[in-house]
Amino acid sequence: MSYLTKIIGTKIEEVSGMQPIDVPVTKPISLLHVMSEGFHIISEIKRSSPSKGMIRETVDVAKRARQYEKAGATMISVLTDTTYFNGSFDDLRQVADVVTIPVLCKDFIIDERQLDYAKHYGASVALLIVAALHPTRLHELTRYARSIGLDVLVEVHDEAELRIALELDDVLIGINNRDLKTFEVSLETSIDLMKRYPEVTFVSESGVSTVEAAARLQEAGASAILVGEALMREEDPIRLLEELKTCSLKSVD
């Protein structure tokens, strides 16, 4: 059984127990517009993962979110999965309460109820993973997310999934360098797809821990990178974030 299959099985059980929740409906932001110019960093709150185990068990989520924003992050991603990533919707709320930049609810979303919870707890963006959803369901959840004021980041891992994502209108596409079936990581996943689709605005996700990696991805066409584990392992995430931002400054020079 792959990691993804196991996680989705758990999500099906979780969703069945989710109670109705108040959803404040607002106008969604245009994440695609935000990311279309320049080079951006999406910084992540990620306590653990199935492949790496515990990354940082004790963390002041609000403090770290403020550090991310201060250092120039364009958006903050928050893992809300509890079983496999030790995250929570409480983490999401703590981040949303203290920053002014967009906040991404990063989870394995398969149902509208999860989107309701994401919006209720302060997210402005939700992650939808092509590999986890039938194309019809992907379209349905995208429409529903926007109807309650959430923009979406649509995640792909290969060209077949990218073609499905491109059928959606005006969405930002993230390329996960981590294979969700095996959890193995390769930056070549992003580099290959970005070179073949230079007209698409892409976020490169996973496996970015150095300035050299960030620069390589930007040169290949990334408009943004999502950095989680590397920042969470840092006692001083501001330093690493500022170093990663130098890629953007050098491109301007």
Swiss-Prot record:
Keywords: Amino-acid biosynthesis, Aromatic amino acid biosynthesis, Decarboxylase, Lyase, Tryptophan biosynthesis. GO terms for molecular function: indole-3-glycerol-phosphate synthase activity; phosphoribosylanthranilate isomerase activity. Its EC number is 4.1.1.48. Pathway: Amino-acid biosynthesis; L-tryptophan biosynthesis; L-tryptophan from chorismate: step 4/5. It catalyses: 1-(2-carboxyphenylamino)-1-deoxy-D-ribulose 5-phosphate + H(+) = (1S,2R)-1-C-(indol-3-yl)glycerol 3-phosphate + CO2 + H2O. PROSITE patterns: IGPS. GO terms for biological process: L-tryptophan biosynthetic process. Belongs to the TrpC family. This is Indole-3-glycerol phosphate synthase. The gene is trpC.
